[in-house]
Amino acid sequence: MRLHGLIAAALAAMAWTAAAQAEPATAKVVLHAPLRILDPVLTNAYITRNHGYLIYDTLFAIDTQGRPQPQMVDRWTVSDDKLSYTFTLRPGLKFHDGTAVTGEDVVASLARWEQRDPMGKRLAAATQTMDSPSADSFRIVLKQPFGLVLETLGKPGSPVPFIMPKRIAQTPATEAIKESIGSGPYRFDAKAFEAGVKAVYIKNPDYVPRQEPAAYFSGGKVPMFDRIEVINVPDAQTAVNALHQGEIDFVENVAPDLLPQLGQAKGVTVERYGENTDTYMLRMNWKQPPLDNPKIRQAVLAALNQTDYLDASLGDPKFYRLCGAMLSCISAYRSDVGATQTRPADLARARALLKEGGYKGEKIVVLHPTDVRSLSALAPVTAQALRSIGMTVDVQSMDWATLLSRRSKDAPV
């Protein structure tokens, strides 16, 4: 649950995929959440980000070592004082509407994205000018050194700096785009889209992958199917049954208790797709009382137990591990300093901190996503923990898209 920030419930969960062993011209897949929001700049939902990676392309991309590699960019130069970056685009890049990708498209796309993304805002603050000297190039001139220019342009976390036509990128960053047109390996079939139900992607015949082999987000993106249909199947058992029967080809998140069924199925492969694929985080609205009080937030931390969350979501300890690092648990920047969150809950200390913080029974709203299986079990755990130390809790259930919209607002509940 990428509710970035908080008090340390950084619970690393191991995610699983299941795919039928076949490569049909059409791939029918079930992903972790229903797709409702199409604008990859307007939301940081990973379901929308993944939608974006199918139809858009990026200037740079991160490889398996975490290093930025060129994607849409062919070559670039950096001035001796590290203040001027000039980039030349790969030849022949075309949007799905047939128009050529230009430096002006890049500048407009980055200008919109910078208004929504934290790293983009930092880059913008360090930038003096951003322009397009020629049709196939763009330039960033800094007013002060910024050592993460390439890393920022290639960041895979939402919102991703996807490149779209200038006419679309000129949409205000507070409004949703009305067309989903990129230059990526697949075209989005807008007529076939049913929000929260179905999304269809058609192979882009004009897409030319890079020659380098694929490596994480970088390298050649080779379309393996002529058509991809993303289908929402809310019930986990129904999705597994459909996989058994050959009605779908891929399930992104498999409920752990259903893995034995898949392990015995012919023609089905079950794989873990990463060592640190998901990190659950509990994020509090620290701008509003009573959670603007550090003592109250410390009380919440003392009341939580990572194992309770992971058992509720995943069940078997072999599918998860405890981790107290605020950054990625496999990152070179990992540190367990101050990692109290992996200790058992201390309810007596939590109650004492509440009293010390002057808690007066104010209502705490816990947002509960009902249509994302891996997340739906978490809110009840939080509610029970807070109630156990005497806090007033209001659990509000909603779909994931509504939660994301609600979460982006810091106004009182």
Language model segments and positions:
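Structural transition elements
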Residues: 186, 320-356, 372-377
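Aromatic- and charge-enriched surface segment that lines or borders ligand/interaction sites
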Residues: 74-119, 133, 138-141, 242, ...
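Gly/Pro-rich hinge or "lid" segments in bacterial periplasmic/extracellular proteins
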Residues: 67, 156-229, 237-238, 347-348, ...
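Ligand/substrate-recognition segments at binding pockets and active sites
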Residues: 235-236, 320, 351-413
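Periplasmic-binding protein-like
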Residues: 287, 291-331, 377-378
